[in-house]
Amino acid sequence: MVVYLAFGLLYSVTTPLFEASDELWHYPFIKRLADGDGLPVQTPDQIGPWRQEGSQPPLYYALGALLTRWVDTSDMEVLRWINPHADIGVLTRDRNVNMVIHTERERWPFSGAALAVYLVRWMSVGLGAVTVLAAWLTARELAPGNRWLPLAAGAITAFNPMFLFVTASVNNDALVIALCAVCLWLMVRYVRGEPRPWHWALLGGLLGLASLSKASALGMLALAAATGAVVGWRTRHTPAGGWRALLVAGVGIAVPLVTIGGWWYYRNWLLYRDPLGLNAFVAIVGPRHPVPTLRQLLGEWQGFVMSYWAFFGGVNVAAPRWVYWALSLLGGAGLLGMALHVWRLVRARERD
């Protein structure tokens, strides 16, 4: 954990301001909330400096605003001097990769908007530490008594170059990943244990917070439902088991989830007639024409792999090719090991 924090802080102070993925758009959302201007209403004819990120659920931005509201950030537009010639999202020979033009305002000692950005970056590093801890706890739950597997799970999570890069920047992914990782750990515990009603309420509350961090967290609801189903099936021969356990799980999760996150999706419905707000998001960022086919998406597999492992800057600073090969081989070995482990478990159960 100490090594992760050291690397995370190093990434946070060496990555130039606004040169980390969509940090250029994430931070203005935080500044708007810190200035007391409230949540933006997204329209394609009035695009704010937060662009499409203003359509994102607001929890991460609200936390960043609370952390930095005391900082005078009136110099943000001077600091955020956009480079009109930057090659964003593509690899080019001219290497014009800087999304902004950098000035002396970024130098130590930090002040103004630069200080605010670094404070939020350090908050993200802390959230990354929560993710690493949750990975360690999940592996320990899955393999009790195994000293090395939890350590390996934490290390693989912590030292993924892209994970370090994202969790050392202003990015709501840092919060949603941390919350989902904790939820995953709890679900593994519940499958193996005997969860009580308050356990389900805790899971529902965390899922509600995750849904207020990024809409993609709603995908965790399928895992939560599966967890409740497994617990119900495993306890079906007990008085409080079976359908009763499934009902307790469903209500326990749904009530805090809707209470915490429901208002955001209702607001989206009122404003955009889309609970996820995706139509407003796409109207600003622009739709893809033509709609890609499955074959085209498979043809972009290399880009997906690169962006998972190490694709820095504005998705325009790549690592050497051998890095992707090495990391992909490591990931492939992990998948092979998982398949082998499952096969051994099945064989052991057949023998029993």
PLM feature spans:
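Short helix- or helix-capping micro-motifs
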Residues: Y4, A153-A158, L207, S211
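Interfacial juxtamembrane loops and adjacent helix segments
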Residues: R32-R121, G286-R288, V315-A319
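Membrane-interface transmembrane helices that cradle and orient dolichyl/undecaprenyl
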Residues: R140-P144, C183-H199, A210, G232-R234
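Perimembrane helix-loop-helix junctions
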Residues: L186, R192, M220-V255
